[in-house]
Amino acid sequence: MKQVRIIQMLMAVVMVLALGSCSSDILSEVENQNGKQTVKMEFVGKVIGFDQQGSSKAKVQTRATSSSWKDGDKIYITFYNGSTVVLGEASYSSASGWSVSYDGNLETGSNLKCEARYFVNATFSSSSLVSLNANSEIYEDLNATYAYSNGSLTVTATLSPKTGRIRFTGNSGEKIYTTGISVYTTFSPAINTFSTSNAMITSTVTSDGSTPYIYGYFTDNDRNLGLVGSDYAFTRTCTSCMLNVGESGYMAIPSESSHNNWRSGLYVKASGVEFKMIPVAGYSGGFFLMAETETTEALYKSVNGTASTSQLPIDDVSYPFVSTFIEKLNNETKLSFSLPSAEQWSYAAKGGNKTQGYTYAGSNTPGDVAWYSANCTSKQTVKTKAPNELGIYDMSGNVGEFVSTIYSTYYPYIFGGGYCSNVSYIEKTSNSNTYSGYDKGGYNFGGSYSYSSYDCRSKGVGFRLILTCK
């Protein structure tokens, strides 16, 4: 027995001496074979830039490339070891080059499969979650390869753009809001998954006359791009060559005098129903957009899960039901819709900064702009009378409209009058912008505004949306 123990001890000493002659990388790997391991990595490859769009709008078939790296650059690598996935995070140092930390064991061999991703303008958290934004660049190679043997690791990858990119030219300091573009918001190496958002994107034109690039892709197949400024809104259906993967382009910010293929107004689609928002500038409380029409049955029902094409205004809905609808709409569009306040509604009804001082919303003749008791006995299709100065329809008559302003607990105001109102009750709200003269006529709309019980609903009462930019 003593001889056996002596032999075992001698063998252990020999193993220690043998390990001591190995490189530190290999020693580290042996010591950490069940935990995170770190080895040197040779990276063979490059980053491919974007196709540049020339001033003639024709795509120039040249690509900028880069093989230079900065301290702190990271490449996230998904190694495949047979059916096992090994996650790696490679970091660059100008002093020592690339090193990669990974959990698990790499397969030995060459031309082995891996995926590589490189990020610019991203935030790397301690939990290895990569936080991204509209200005983050993502380059990847889903068919990269690696070779590994005895602690020597080489990764070969050509990192290409995952998105397209676009910028807007205009006046320095001009602030714009963009809709219709989806961007990546996070990357989780642990599950090898990206998350995305189609929320409104805020950009500002810099001193060089353009905004920073937005990196993303069109949210839907319609390829509708919306731009909102401090006093305008435009929408454009973009060509198939715009914002494709690897494409770089630019567009001039449109104006009222020169907007070419842009449609005036912000067009939004929800549950297959498109509706238009009109910019309302000059309001003391800040710029907002108001729906061109009262909320239609088509929009309300479709967002709530029942397909409809009806262009009648929705009515017979309670205030809580309206709130639930708006929450669903915001979740779907990632925009910030709400009911207008009494002041916002009144300002828009009068024509905003384009007001002509009409008695009714858009005219001194009620029949030109309003459905009311003298010309109908039920609600009518929206947008069949003339609009007001801003291009907004039915702010006098058709159906009364909830606003967010509450008269007292559980009693929201109703503005605009409806089809059952007589002519004196469909005038715009008073120039004083106060509600001291509110009428208690309930759903008969005695006066330009009324109020109702919070959870009550009635035929002839609907609502209209506004959108604020955030």
Named regions from a protein language model:
Residues 8, 19-260:
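Sec-type signal peptide cleavage vicinity
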Residues 266-320, 396-397, 404:
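A short glycine-rich, aromatic-capped structural motif
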Residues 457-470:
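Short, structured beta-strand segments at or near domain termini in extracellular proteins/domains
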Residues 319-433, 459:
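Functional-site microenvironments in short loops/helix caps that host divalent-cation chemistry
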Residues 288, 295, 300-308, 327-335, ...:
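Short capping motifs at secondary-structure boundaries
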Residues 238, 311-313, 382-383, 387, ...:
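Active-site rim elements
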Residues 381, 429-451:
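Surface-exposed intrinsically disordered loops and tails
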Residues 1-20:
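Sec-dependent bacterial lipoprotein signal peptides
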